[in-house]
Amino acid sequence: MSTRPLDVLGAPGWGEVDARGLVQPGAKEWALDWWVGASDRWRRASQEAAVRQSELGAGAVVETRMKVPDGDAVQRVWAVAAGGGPAVAVVQVGNEAATAFAAALVVEAPGAALAVDRTGVAVGAKPVLAWDRAPVGAAVGHGAVKALLDAEGGTATGLDHKGRDLAAMVWPLPHTARMAVSASLGRGALPPPADLPDADAVLRGWQVHLERGARIEVPDDALARRIDRNRRRWLGRTGRMETADVAELCELSVRLDHHGYHDDAAVVLDEIAARWTTEAPTERLRAFGVHHDLTGDQQAAIRFAEPVAEAVEAAARMGAEVPLAPVERLLIAAGQDRAAQDLRRLDVRPAATPSEGLRAELVADQGEELLVAPGYRPVWRGGPLAAYGLPTRFGPLSYAVRWHGPNPALLWELDGRPGPVPVSLRAPALDRSWSSDQPTGETLLATSRSLPW
């Protein structure tokens, strides 16, 4: 079953919520399921057919709805940092039905001892759930849990565990009422939900983080949502780098840099540099090279010169490919001219440029040329496309494509870094005859019959 991540930018600890609303920490020591006692029986979200899920705010809040008589039971889950500490999930259940029902949270921790008191649930000695409003009933162990559920909301079926590694808590929920618990995703303090940001605050906070990167506007709502969702997930992964191998970290760093999250990418690169490994030398060199090309940060180049040199040596020993031009540019910027000369003499294979996904459709560089919207899709014709602060090797690029009848108009601004020759801009996917060496401008492009529209 598919899962959605629960993580917080820069905070340790993480978890997952599956397609039915089952919540687990990353280590999977326990699982939290939700049930609703309505009418004549309990409905377990993980077993009901009428369950659907959606994401709010690029996936910062996951909403799961379960059909009950006269409406829906709605679960919302989001992750926050607990006072600067580890990630904590807030699990909220609300009644959007016309009649009251009972909500139950069921914790399963195979092989562990569970304990419930007035403030929460512990697995072993570790608190895993906390609440502000105590449940009206709680039980530990298969028999006691079944008796509680039978008494509070009708017949309960589908309990999987037979021992004391099962606990259940029940809250009555009148029409429009909600209850919530906080669930530990790491090791550290576990405040109750009232002491943590609510869903609206989390949505606003993530929007602020997303807006730190390059702004991209595409004439496709589904693609726009996917861009934001991917960005949120990349940023969230910076809080759980210990779960990723070096190649995965390199890919994460490149994606962050491509979308303008350079400070976050630098944090990932610091983690890569600290691992002192010989694995994935090509990927490491690409990540360091992309960061330098897209930021021009000389201090970062100096800081990363040593791990870059080590990765070059590892690549030479292993016969791995090396992205020669980006690495050479980084070494020269770091004042390592001798190392750059040695790189040119090495008998290594040059690395091909891998696919860059959506970014390759928005911008690309070829030598001293910058291609604007090189992958413009025919289905976008007539719709607005824009990018603001898109990182390139020549500096941040902003542009917009607007349509005037059959002709596209292009507005652009390149905040260029000093270079030996002027940068030439072209837009071959829109007008193969157009080019300009001006850093800013606007023009009405001609359409070509050879273009795919």
Enumerate the predicted regions with their spans.
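Terminal accessory carbohydrate-recognition/targeting modules of carbohydrate-active enzymes
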Residues: M1-I227, A247, A265, Q336-W453
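Substrate-binding groove/exosite segments of carbohydrate-active enzymes
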Residues: G158-K162, V208-A334, A340-D342
